[in-house]
A protein has these predicted regions:
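Charged, compositionally biased non-catalytic regions
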Residues: 1-25
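Secretory-pathway lumenal glyco-enzymes, predominantly type II signal-anchor Golgi glycosyltransferases
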Residues: 6, 34, 43-48, 205-212
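Short, solvent-exposed loop/turn elements at domain surfaces
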Residues: 10, 68-70, 197
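Intrinsic-disorder-associated interaction segments
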Residues: 13, 94-97, 114, 216, ...
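Short, polar loop/linker segments at the starts of domains and inter-domain junctions
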Residues: 14-23, 63, 75-77, 203-209
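A conserved cap/lid and substrate-binding interface adjacent to the catalytic center
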Residues: 27-137, 154-160, 257
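Serine-dependent carboxylesterase/thioesterase catalytic core
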Residues: 120-206
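Lipolytic serine-hydrolase domain surface
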Residues: 172-257
Length: 257
């Protein structure tokens, strides 16, 4: 939820406080350059943070997309090589990922919140240390970026823990197998009626990343039944037991007798 606090569509360097647990402090803002029609020229997509009590623990958080169904309409779901992790060791085949996600991932820019120094994705990855433990997390489009980033960071020898919510499939079977080897701890959280994690689908040679945790918002009568709310982050968190999460527009209205 912390990334959602900072989210203003189209804003490259968001301002304002963000509530992080304990001694965690935000260190960088992450923006992506639009390469698809429905996104702005440059859009804030997340942040990095460091635990001051344990500087060897860093987090990379990506927020979700309000345009996920636009993405479904606009992306072609073509697979392309993913150059950040080499080949899949079990089959010696190059891993392939969804072209649009890969283009957005390659466009990421990391801006230091104190100095304003900007790093490209390649520069960020060059700083990855195997002495640091990284946690990556994301929802929806952010979950797709988190999966790609987790694999790329893990490929550089670091220990990675990944949490993705409502994320679509991002690559083929070779990517899924490589991801399982590279990301030591992975939680892929999927709401049963949400269609997005089922896309683009196995018929197009895509495969889900492992360690899926299935939840079901249909078991909660207070959550509205619609495609948008099945996919919404608050529905996910509420179903997972977040008592402080406000369902907002996804709360089903009860009829007055």
């Amino acid at each position: 939820m912390a990334a959602e606090q900072l989210y203003k569509r189209g804003e490259k360097d968001p301002v304002g406080a963000v509530r992080l647990p304990g001694q965690w402090r935000r260190t960088q803002n992450i923006a992506m350059q639009a390469r698809v029609e429905f996104l702005h020229q440059s859009e804030f997509i997340g942040f990095t943070a460091r635990d001051l009590d344990n500087p060897q623990h860093e987090a990379i958080v990506f927020h979700g997309s309000q345009t996920i169904f636009d993405w479904i309409d606009d992306f072609e779901f073509s697979l392309d090589s993913f150059p950040y992790i080499g080949t899949n060791w079990s089959s010696d085949m190059p891993v392939r990922t969804e072209y649009g996600f890969t283009q957005l991932y390659e466009s990421l820019r990391f801006t230091d919140v104190e100095t304003g120094t900007v790093q490209s994705l390649a520069q960020f990855l060059s700083t990855v240390s195997n002495e640091v433990s990284y946690t990556v997390a994301g929802h929806s489009l952010g979950g797709a970026l988190a999966a790609l980033h987790g694999a790329a960071v893990g490929y550089r020898g670091a220990h990675v823990t990944s949490y993705t919510y409502a994320a679509p499939m991002v690559g083929d079977k070779a990517f899924a197998e490589a991801y399982q080897s590279l990301v030591k701890t992975s939680y892929t959280i999927v709401n049963k009626p949400d269609i997005v994690p089922k896309l683009p689908g196995s018929l197009l040679q895509y495969d889900s990343i492992p360690q899926m945790i299935l939840i079901n918002s249909l078991e909660y009568p207070e959550i509205k039944h619609c495609l948008t709310c099945y996919h919404h982050l608050t529905s996910y968190l509420y179903t997972l037991g977040c008592s402080d999460c406000d369902l907002g527009l996804c709360r089903r209205q009860t009829r007055q007798s």
